[in-house]
Amino acid sequence: MKATDFSKVAEVYDNNSFRFDELAFDIHLEGYIHGQPQQHYNVMDLACGTGIYLDHQMGHFDAHSIEWHGVDASEAMLGKAREKLKRGNLVQGLAEDLPYVSNSFDFIINNYAFHHFTRKSQVLDEVYRVLKDGGIFKTHNINVHDMENWWIYQYFPSAYTEDLERFWQKQRIFRELEDRGFKVRLETNYQMEKLKVTDYLQLAENRDISVLTIISDDDYYAGLSKMKNDLEHNPAKTMMNDFSELVCIAEK
């Protein structure tokens, strides 16, 4: 599978407002804290990127003693995270070779990033290793197998082919976690709605969405040109859009 070069998107990554809208208060972390009362918690954002999740959650959980950790392979993305965050431990490292001793973390979150890992099975082995007994691994991602008519795929068809290679199906995610000894609960949601094409042109032009960085330039500019041509002929053009998300909670 192809990999995104995040050094090329770090500068524009946070221009996508949807990244901020989608990361609300983490009810699963709250549930873990309430269900496992203790004096101190270690929480890791695995593939933390520019620190959006950590920045959102730190304020919500000020009443608790939490040591926040962020790990990412991209120094460019971590540089943006350091600009946001006044505290927390940010480390450059690989998810398949985490720089932590075993049984270190109470809660590990992986937001919109599992598809980037080229050695996913090894990543899950590492997550299991560094997670404490009774700890939680949460992964939250789009569910591409149930959203064939996502606006991205309508204008950039080769992106769908790439994503089918990058994303595990939900059944495999469940099985891989369960085979390692996790107790797994997986939920998906789905929505179909009509979107205005004009509302998504800027997102396409920003080219921060990872799959748009790995398709060929020819495919990318062909899709962008089609969006612009459609809007030139009909500024009010709409399209039906599929969207689905997956949340998986795995308890060690």
Describe the function of each predicted region:
Residues M44-D97:
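Class I SAM-dependent methyltransferase SAM/SAH-binding core
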Residues M1-Y41, I52-H56, H60, M77-K80, I136-E165:
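Conserved class I S-adenosyl-L-methionine
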Residues E165-R180:
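Short alpha-helix
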Residues S121-I136:
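A short glycine-rich, Lys/Arg-flanked "PGG" loop and its adjoining helix->strand segment in the class I
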Residues I109:
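A conserved beta-strand element that flanks and buttresses the S-adenosyl-L-methionine
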Residues D21, T50, K183-K252:
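Conserved Class I S-adenosyl-L-methionine
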Residues Y112-H116:
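Short catalytic micro-motifs in class I SAM-dependent methyltransferases
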